[in-house]
Swiss-Prot record:
The keyword Lipoprotein does not apply. GO terms for molecular function: S-methyl-5-thioribose-1-phosphate isomerase activity. Keywords: Amino-acid biosynthesis, Isomerase, Methionine biosynthesis. Pfam families: IF-2B. It comes from Geotalea uraniireducens (strain Rf4). The active site is at D237 (proton donor). This is Methylthioribose-1-phosphate isomerase. It comes from the Bacteria. Belongs to the eIF-2B alpha/beta/delta subunits family. MtnA subfamily. InterPro entries: IF-2B-related, IF-M1Pi, IF_2B-like_C, Initiation_fac_2B_a/b/d, M1Pi_N, NagB/RpiA_transferase-like.
Length: 346
């Protein structure tokens, strides 16, 4: 891949600005945790695994900003940093997973001096980024055998390198199949209202030389019924214990259409996206975003002023529509409640 989604460089967090793609490839530098939190909230960085990495790096920056004479003061301020990060996006469980991991690491080194704790947190954030890249490659290896020679794959939103530290989850499966020499092509849903499929997925795949065709969201059923789509692969922001999966709004519609047309529908996600504390998708909090995202496109109005708007950022696909969940530890099928718990224990 010829771009970096996020990295720690010279005690700064550097992110590609995803709101500027595909028109401009711009990298922003962040030196304080509040600006990282705002970047997450403003979708300069997005995608559950990437948000987790950003939160970890934001906490590492925050630890460096803290002025404290005592451990008690330091840890009290660190809790505040973590709370700011936790309030950015409520649905992506990787955010909370990364925050808790950083808190545990800090607590486990409480006996060390404060500068050492700051360096340990920086190292842990970098480790989370490096691990995410390895995890995505493993997801790709596990999912590639599910993609047949000559297949046309439908994907929704962006679950690629831009949504992770690199390589991607759903696009990781597609990349691995392409790297294995399989002749494949991809249909990318544009994914309203933020157009992640149009702006980001198409951009990534074209950079990699993987054939991609862009369609509007309401065309998916048409192409499925015509027999032009062989398999669907999407990412995830949170997966409940029973396999119900929260992903970008519109994913549920794709899954229902896929089942109607007897097309396998797969979810690709790291184990860190599992939330086994939730029995089902009914318990997953769904973020609702500003109405302007629906009523305006690139700053221009596309709806009458004052119209009522609903703008949930995610929906939940019930497990019965999912043919398999592809993780770095393997592919889970069937009894998700049993198999996901077994997977975590491996």
């Amino acid at each position: 891949m010829s771009f970096r989604t996020i990295e720690w460089r010279d005690n700064k967090v550097v992110m590609i600005d995803q709101t500027r793609l595909p028109g401009e490839e711009v990298y922003n530098e962040y030196t304080d945790f509040q600006s990282v939190a705002e970047a997450i909230r403003g979708m300069i960085i997005r995608g559950a695994p990437a948000i987790g990495v950003a939160a970890a790096m934001g906490i590492a920056l925050g630890a460096r900003e803290i002025i404290a004479d005592t451990h008690e003061s330091f840890f009290r301020q660190l809790d505040n940093v973590c709370n700011v990060m936790a309030r950015t996006r409520p649905t992506a469980v990787n955010l909370f997973w990364a925050i808790e991991r950083m808190k545990r690491v800090a607590e486990s080194h409480r006996d060390k001096d404060l500068n050492s704790i700051r360096e340990i947190l920086k190292a842990e954030a970098i480790r989370i980024e490096e691990e995410d890249l390895e995890i995505c490659r493993a997801i790709g290896r596990n999912g590639a055998p599910l993609i047949k020679e000559g297949a046309t794959i439908l994907t929704h939103c962006n679950a690629g390198g831009l949504a992770t530290a690199g390589y991607g989850t759903a696009l990781g499966v597609i990349r691995a199949a392409h790297e294995a020499g399989k002749r494949i092509q991809v249909f990318a849903d544009e994914t309203r209202p933020w157009l992640q499929g149009a702006r980001l997925t198409s951009w990534e795949l074209m950079k990699d030389g993987i054939p991609v065709t862009l369609i509007s969201d309401n065309m998916a059923g048409y192409f499925m019924r015509k027999g032009e789509i062989d398999v669907c692969v999407v990412g995830a922001d949170r997966i409940a214990a029973n396999g119900d999966t929260a992903n970008k709004i519109g994913t549920y519609s794709v899954a229902v259409l896929a089942k109607e047309n007897k097309i396998p529908f797969y979810v690709a996600a790291p184990v860190s996206t599992l939330d086994l504390s939730l029995k089902s998708g009914e318990d997953i909090p769904i973020e609702e975003r500003h109405s302007r995202e629906v009523t305006h496109l690139q700053g221009l109005p596309v709806a009458p002023e004052g119209v009522k708007v609903r703008n949930p950022a995610f929906d939940v696909t019930p497990a019965r529509y999912i043919a398999g969940i592809i993780t770095e530890k393997g592919v889970v099928r069937g009894d998700y409640e049993k198999e996901l718990r077994a997977l975590v224990g491996r």
